[in-house]
Design a protein with these regions (language model features):
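Active-site environment of divalent metal-dependent phosphoester hydrolases
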Residues: 9-13, 38-40, 65-69, 137, ...
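Catalytic phosphate/metal-binding cores of nucleic-acid and nucleotide-processing enzymes, i.e., regions
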Residues: 5, 77, 99, 145-154, ...
Length: 225
C-alpha cells in the first residue's frame, strides 16, 4: 500500500503512532510531503533519522527544510537565519547541533537531495505529490498557498496531494479561529477539493484540534493520530 503524510512538524510520537495504526510494513511505501522539522519539537530530527534508514520511505522538500538549509549553509546571512528561527527553526537548529558532526552532515546531505514533487500512477489513477502546490518554479512549489476553490491544473486528471497550508487556514489565516471554533470539540480533517487534497491537519501548532493525517492512495482511506 502507498501512504502519504504531510507536515509532521516535529511530532515524532504521532508519527510513530501513525505507523502503528496503518500497520506500516516492508511491503508498503510511505511518502512525506515535507515540513518534517520545526515548530513541534526536536522530534523532527528523529523523524528524519527514521526516514533516512527506510528504503521504502520517500520524502519531498518542504519550505521549512528549505529555510533550514539556507540558514545552515549561509550562517552569515542574518535575514535567512532570522527567517528560519522566527518560523520555529530554533528547535531544529538545537537538535541538529546535538548530533555528531557526521550525523549532522548526513542529515543535511539527505535534505539537500530531496525532490520537491513526485508523480505517481496507481491502479490507473494519477497523483501529483507536492508540498505547496504545482508550479513552474521550485520556490512556488514550496510556498504557494491555494484556497479551498483551488483545482488541479493538470489536464490528464492528476490529483494534487499537498500540505503546507493548514486546512484551518485555507479560507484565510484570519478565519482559522472561526474554523476551529466551528469544530465544536472535533478535530481537523483532510480537505478534499476539485482535484486538490490537503493533508495538513496542523501538527506542530498549539491547539487541541490538531492531529496527524495520513491518506492511503489505493482507496483514499484516511487515518488520524
Amino acid at each position: 500500500m502507498h501512504y502519504v503524510i504531510a507536515d509532521p512538524h516535529g511530532e515524532y510520537d504521532r508519527y510513530r503512532r501513525m505507523l502503528d495504526l496503518i500497520g506500516f510494513s516492508a511491503g508498503d511505501t510511505l511518502y512525506i510531503l515535507g515540513d518534517v522539522v520545526d515548530r513541534g519539537g526536536i522530534g523532527g530530527i528523529d523523524i528524519l533519522l527514521d526516514l533516512m534508514d527506510r528504503s521504502n520511505a520517500v520524502m519531498l522538500l518542504g519550505n521549512h527544510e528549505a529555510m533550514c538549509l539556507k540558514a545552515i549553509d549561509q550562517p552569515d546571512n542574518q535575514r535567512a537565519v532570522s527567517h528560519w528561527t522566527r518560523n520555529g527553526g530554533q528547535v531544529t537548529r538545537d537538535a541538529l547541533f546535538h548530533l555528531t558532526s557526521e550525523e549532522r552532515e548526513r542529515t543535511l546531505d539527505f535534505l539537500r537531495s530531496l525532490p520537491d514533487h513526485l508523480d505517481l500512477e496507481l491502479n490507473g489513477r494519477r497523483f501529483h505529490l507536492v508540498h505547496g502546490f504545482p508550479a513552474d518554479n521550485p520556490h512556488d512549489r514550496l510556498w504557494l498557498r491555494p484556497g479551498p476553490d483551488a483545482e488541479s491544473p493538470f489536464e490528464d486528471g492528476r490529483t494534487v496531494i499537498a500540505g503546507h497550508t493548514p486546512v484551518c487556514e485555507l479560507w484565510g489565516a484570519d478565519q482559522a479561529a472561526r474554523y476551529l471554533r466551528d469544530l465544536e470539540g472535533g478535530h481537523i480533517r483532510i480537505f478534499h477539493g476539485h482535484g486538490y487534497v490537503n493533508l495538513d491537519c496542523s501538527c506542530g501548532y498549539p491547539f487541541p484540534q490538531r492531529r496527524m493525517a495520513c491518506l492511503r492512495l489505493e482507496d483514499m482511506a484516511e487515518f488520524y493520530t
